[in-house]
């Protein structure tokens, strides 16, 4: 009886742990906003709050009296800051903290939805928690604290999760509703500029094409009709990539061709191709940059806290590389959603790595929109790996 009660208690604690991990990451982010963040002086943060205040005063979505120095982002953090300013009009710090608190909750919800839809099950809060923890200084500043790239991660996650919701829906109405919502999320991403089109939509389309071609090639059917019926999920994913890409492109056209005539802003549409001086070595450096984005930092003492954290970040990058290779070797044993996520991450690394090598403008934080796919792939490896250690073999025998 005591053993049963102890086993039941351990199960409850085990089920609670991932949610505690997720909550701890959120609390840490909020503590940083409230305490150290109060004393951080940053012109970009101040300008975001000024814009939110002006938009509240004008009662508009965009402002003609503002120069958008980092692209014209229609769906961005100013919506959350505007809510904060309505509650705390005389305290910008509390207004900003409230806005970030709501934005991070929406981010967590999108991560949990995506994790559920790709079948991660009990690993879902672990994945969402990993995304919410500030695992590197750049990630902390540009995503969890500054929020500059939070929307660039949120909208692709939401788009992908809603495409899967549409595929998994049993009835026509929720299927169509989820597809429409996915298009709206993609449209919002496109309205923010070209970035998400390149970092997410192009790899999304490439990954679904590869997934569909490999499925059709191995299905063993002799007619297109039978093959498409057999590979239904793969074909629906390809359709989802197509209609969300069209929506994202429509948003970008509105941004670059219509809004550009009425508003002043910097556009990355003017970035030019520039042949890398070091050829393939430049591509290698940029891809290695990606695997360093999990917390590794140059120039810190090995045995200091920051140095140990940097070493852990390097190990996470190495672990991710192992997960990609291992899952590609076990590709045929994976479920469709798991195969797709591996192909999506590989497509992101390939498309972005090659593009960043040739772009005139590059920063390491350009990689952040691919972080949800990276942590999903790590979770898939943990979920699907079948270990048969000697002791386990004896137990099974």
PLM regions and their residue ranges:
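Membrane-interface micro-motifs in multi-pass membrane enzymes
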Residues: 70, 74, 121-167, 192, ...
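Membrane-interface transmembrane helices that cradle and orient dolichyl/undecaprenyl
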Residues: 156-177, 214-218
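Short hydrophobic/aromatic helix or loop-helix immediately within or flanking a transmembrane segment
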Residues: 47-54, 67-90, 285-297
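Membrane-proximal lumenal/periplasmic loop motifs of glycosylation machinery
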Residues: 34-43, 56-79, 93-94
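Transmembrane-helix motifs of polytopic, lipid-linked glycan transferases
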Residues: 97-123, 158, 162, 319-326
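Membrane-interface alpha helices of multi-pass inner-membrane proteins
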Residues: 176-205, 246
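Transmembrane alpha-helix segments characteristic
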Residues: 180-186, 239-245, 329-357
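Hydrophobic/aromatic-rich transmembrane helices and adjacent perimembrane loops
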Residues: 147-155, 308-315, 339-345, 349-387
């Amino acid at each position: 009886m005591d053993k049963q009660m102890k086993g039941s208690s351990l199960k409850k604690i085990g089920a609670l742990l991932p949610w505690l991990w997720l909550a701890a990451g959120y609390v840490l982010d909020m503590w940083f906003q409230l305490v150290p963040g109060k004393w951080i002086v940053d012109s970009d943060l101040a300008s975001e709050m000024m814009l939110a205040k002006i938009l509240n005063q004008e009662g508009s979505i965009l402002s003609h009296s503002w120069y958008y120095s980092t692209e014209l982002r229609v769906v961005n953090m100013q919506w959350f800051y505007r809510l904060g300013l309505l509650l705390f009009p005389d305290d910008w710090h509390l207004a900003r903290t409230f806005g970030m608190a709501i934005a991070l909750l929406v981010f967590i919800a999108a991560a949990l939805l995506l994790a559920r839809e790709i079948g991660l099950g009990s690993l879902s809060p672990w994945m969402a928690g990993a995304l919410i923890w500030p695992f590197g200084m750049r990630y902390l500043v540009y995503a969890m604290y500054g929020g500059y790239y939070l929307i660039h991660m949120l909208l692709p996650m939401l788009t992908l999760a809603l495409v899967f919701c549409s595929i998994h829906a049993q009835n026509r109405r929720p299927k169509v509703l989820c597809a429409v919502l996915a298009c709206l999320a993609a449209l919002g991403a496109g309205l923010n500029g070209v970035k998400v089109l390149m970092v997410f939509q192009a790899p999304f389309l490439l990954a679904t094409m590869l997934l569909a071609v490999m499925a059709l090639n191995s299905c063993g059917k002799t007619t297109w009709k039978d093959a498409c019926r057999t590979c239904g999920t793969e074909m629906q994913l390809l359709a989802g990539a197509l209609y969300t890409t069209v929506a994202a492109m429509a948003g970008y056209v509105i941004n670059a061709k219509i809004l550009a005539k009425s508003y002043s802003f910097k556009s990355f549409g003017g970035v030019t191709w520039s042949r890398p001086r070091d050829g393939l070595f430049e591509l290698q450096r940029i891809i290695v940059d990606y695997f360093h984005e999990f917390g590794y930092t140059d120039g810190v003492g090995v045995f200091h806290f920051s140095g140990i954290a940097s070493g852990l970040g390097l190990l996470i990058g190495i672990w991710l590389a192992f997960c990609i290779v291992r899952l590609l070797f076990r590709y045929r044993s994976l479920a469709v959603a798991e195969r797709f996520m591996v192909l999506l991450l590989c497509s992101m690394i390939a498309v972005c790595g090659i593009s960043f090598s040739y772009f005139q403008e590059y920063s390491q934080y350009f990689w952040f929109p691919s972080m949800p796919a990276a942590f999903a792939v790590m979770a898939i490896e943990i979920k699907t790996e079948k270990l048969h250690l000697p002791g386990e073999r004896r137990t099974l025998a």
